[in-house]
C-alpha cells in the first residue's frame, strides 16, 4: 500500500511540474500549441520544427508550408487522401513502424487524423509515437508525442494535455481545408432513395395499366 502511495505521489508531482512549465507557442498566426518552456526550434526551408522533452516522453510540433500555387482540395475525400499520404510517408520513413488506430478527429472546426505509430524493437524497448495531422490550404501541421513501452500506462495524462493544448484561430474554417463543405451523402442512403424511387415508378405504371384495363371492361 505504501508503494502505491509513493508511486501516485511521484506521478502527481511529475504531472504538476509538467503543467506548470508549459508555455504556449505560436507555430504561426493561426495555430498555437503548449510545450515545456525548454523547447528548441529549428527553421529550415519553410519548415519549423519545435521539440521538447518531459520526464515521461517527448513532444514535436511541425509546421510545413505547402507548395505555393497548391490547388485547393475540392471535397472531404480529397482531404482524406492527402492525410493518408502523410500517414503512409511517416510509416515508410520509420523503417519498421506500423500505423495503428487511424481515426478521424476534429480540432476546432477543422478535420484531422489521429494515429499511433508502433515501432517494435526485439533487442530493446519498443516505441510508441502518437500523432495528430492537420492540413490547411497554406500549411500542414504535425503534432507528435513519443514514449517508450515501459511508460505507456503513465503518459496518458501528459499526452492528452499536449494534444488538447492545440488551439486554432477563429479565422480557420473548414473551407480552408477543402472547397465543398456540404455534408456528403453516403452511398447507402443514395441506394435506398434510388430503390424507393424505382418501386414507386413501377407501382405507378402498374396502377395505370390496371386502371386502363378496368376502364375498357366498363366501356
Predicted regions and their residues:
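Soluble, non-membrane globular domain cores that form compact, hydrophobic packing
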Residues: 13, 154-158, 212-219
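Sec/Tat signal peptide C-region and signal peptidase I cleavage site
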Residues: 15-19
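N-terminal "mature-domain start" segment
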Residues: 20-47
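C-terminal single-pass membrane-anchor helix
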Residues: 177-219
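Sec-dependent N-terminal signal peptides
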Residues: 4-14
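Surface-exposed amphipathic alpha-helical segments
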Residues: 28-30, 37-39, 141-183
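Conserved polar/disulfide-associated segments of primarily extracytoplasmic proteins
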Residues: 46-129, 133-135, 141-142, 147
Amino acid at each position: 500500500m505504501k508503494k502505491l502511495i509513493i508511486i501516485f505521489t511521484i506521478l502527481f508531482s511529475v504531472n504538476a511540474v509538467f503543467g506548470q512549465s508549459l508555455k504556449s507557442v505560436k507555430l504561426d498566426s493561426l495555430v498555437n500549441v503548449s510545450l515545456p518552456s525548454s523547447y528548441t526550434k529549428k527553421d529550415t526551408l519553410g519548415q519549423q520544427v519545435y521539440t521538447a522533452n518531459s520526464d515521461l516522453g517527448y513532444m514535436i510540433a511541425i509546421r510545413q508550408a505547402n507548395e505555393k500555387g497548391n490547388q485547393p482540395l475540392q471535397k472531404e475525400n480529397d482531404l482524406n487522401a492527402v492525410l493518408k499520404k502523410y500517414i503512409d510517408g511517416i510509416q515508410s520513413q520509420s523503417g519498421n513502424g506500423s500505423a495503428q488506430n487511424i481515426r478521424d478527429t476534429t480540432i476546432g472546426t477543422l478535420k484531422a487524423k489521429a494515429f499511433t505509430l508502433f515501432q517494435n524493437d526485439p533487442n530493446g524497448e519498443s516505441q510508441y509515437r502518437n500523432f495528430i495531422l492537420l492540413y490547411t490550404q497554406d500549411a500542414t501541421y504535425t503534432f507528435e508525442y513519443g514514449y517508450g513501452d515501459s511508460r505507456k500506462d503513465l503518459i496518458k495524462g501528459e499526452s492528452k494535455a499536449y494534444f488538447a493544448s492545440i488551439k486554432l484561430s477563429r479565422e480557420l474554417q473548414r473551407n480552408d481545408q477543402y472547397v465543398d463543405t456540404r455534408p456528403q451523402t453516403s452511398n447507402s442512403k443514395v441506394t435506398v432513395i434510388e430503390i424507393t424511387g424505382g418501386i414507386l415508378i413501377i407501382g405507378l405504371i402498374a396502377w395505370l395499366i390496371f386502371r386502363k384495363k378496368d376502364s375498357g371492361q366498363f366501356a
